[in-house]
From Swiss-Prot:
The keyword Nucleotide-binding does not apply. The chain crosses the membrane at residues 33-53, 77-98, 113-133, 178-198, 226-246, 288-308, 320-340, 347-367. Its cofactor is heme b. PROSITE patterns: CYTB_CTER, CYTB_NTER. Heme b b562 binds at H83, H182. It comes from Napaeozapus insignis (Woodland jumping mouse). One of its GO terms (molecular function) is ubiquinol-cytochrome-c reductase activity. The gene is MT-CYB. A ubiquinone binds at H201. Binds 2 heme b groups non-covalently. It is found in: Mitochondrion inner membrane. Keywords: Electron transport, Heme, Iron, Membrane, Metal-binding, Mitochondrion, Mitochondrion inner membrane, Respiratory chain, Transmembrane, Transmembrane helix, Transport, Ubiquinone. This is Cytochrome b. Disulfide bonds: none annotated.
Length: 379
């Protein structure tokens, strides 16, 4: 008699994806972040659903509805902070997941990689719109500054901005549509994640060596389900520690003041996970140039597979590429720090140098290092 999980049409799909899935036996903890992202998405959808039950997307009541959630709703403060810090957790896992893909050469699965870039863009759009919803000072001014960047697009820029705003400034119409998109996008992200998994299971997972591991694979369950369960436990511990001990650690104090179009904060900045891109945007004096650099800072990931010219897939045996990779990580951390600083000397020049290095390492230095490593292997 065939087991029901191998026979039932629906169970068969789940079985082939999470139970009997042939998995390389040597994948490390860096491969856990994909499942962490799934858990983060589930947390965000659930907490977001409960928040949406009490939130009102109207400029006059949005701020007070968030206050009401925290003060009057049963465990509303916990749901709100789980959602806000869950977004930070989401981005930590997302950056580590992309970083692992770059280090171990997972970008050679082009379809999976491109869907991943789409997912990254969708998550960033969702997080940006979510930041606007509490209608605090930084919500309002962040929305004004970031949406206003679209006016740099030639010919249609100004019309496009007014179309997105639904008027001549960020107001009620903007907040309502941002709430609608913020609600629907996580479900689109969930659908994209399924497509991401579909393409991944077509090729099979990569492994730290970057070598084909078809001859040495083990079932996903129980080996990796237990490993993921431990990861979920540690992730939950970290998230709950953040929520229960320092819920406002990653937020902005300005967002505890209601939005006031007549009072500009001294330093407008987005959430910490956008600061690297914001620093790249600010490092270019020209508005259009800054917007192009901002978009390219994410879309540059799409051309990484075409710049790969190394004989070895993974960086595990490529010391020169490893040095450049960690220089890139250091550059991104520097950009994140600079994005949170005021626009003055010496932060301007540090941001410009870090931005140049970011593009230089990915576009020129890494392919050159790979070429040199290929030559050294033959030497």
């Amino acid at each position: 008699m065939i087991n029901i999980r191998k026979k039932h049409p629906l169970m068969k799909i789940l079985n082939e994806s999470f139970i009997d899935l042939p998995t390389p036996c040597n994948i490390s903890s860096w491969w856990n972040f994909g499942s962490f992202l799934g858990a983060c998405l589930a947390i965000q959808i659930l907490t977001g659903l409960f928040l949406a039950m009490h939130y009102t997307s109207d400029t006059t009541t949005a701020f007070s509805s968030v206050t009401h959630i925290c003060r009057d709703v049963n465990y509303g403060w916990l749901i709100r902070y789980l959602h806000a810090n869950g977004a930070s957790m989401f981005f930590i896992c997302l950056f580590l997941h992309v970083g692992r893909g770059l280090y171990y050469g997972s970008y050679t699965f082009i379809e999976t990689w491109n869907i991943g870039i789409l997912l990254l863009s969708a998550v960033m759009a969702t997080a940006f719109m979510g930041y606007v919803l509490p209608w605090g000072q930084m919500s309002f001014w962040g929305a004004t500054v970031i949406t206003n960047l679209l006016s740099a697009i030639l010919y249609i820029g100004s019309t496009l901005v007014e179309w997105i705003w639904g008027g001549f400034s960020v107001d009620k119409a903007t907040l309502t549509r941002f709430f609608a998109f913020h609600f629907i996008l996580p479900f689109i992200i969930a659908a994209l994640a399924i497509v991401h998994l579909l393409f991944l299971h077509e090729t099979g997972s990569n492994n730290p060596t970057g070598l084909i591991s078809d001859a040495d694979k083990i079932p996903f369950h129980p080996h990796y389900t237990i490993k993921d369960a431990l990861g979920f436990l540690l992730m939950s511990l970290f998230l709950l520690s953040l929520v229960l001990f320092s819920p406002d650690l990653l937020g902005d104090p300005d967002n505890y003041s209601p939005a006031n179009p007549l009072n500009t904060p001294p330093h407008i900045k987005p959430e910490w996970y956008f600061l690297f891109a914001y620093a790249i945007l600010r490092s270019i004096p020209n508005k259009l140039g800054g917007v192009i650099a901002l978009v390219l800072s994410i879309l540059i990931l799409a051309i990484v597979p075409f710049l790969h010219n190394a004989n070895q897939r993974s960086m595990i045996f490529r010391p020169l590429s490893q040095c450049l990779y960690w220089a890139l990580v250091a550059g991104l951390i520097t950009l994140t720090w600079i994005g949170g600083q005021p626009v003055e000397h010496p932060f301007i020049i540090i941001g410009q140098v870090a931005s140049i290095l970011y593009f230089l390492i990915i576009l020129i230095l890494m392919p050159l290092a790979s070429f040199l490593e290929n030559k050294l292997l033959k030497w």
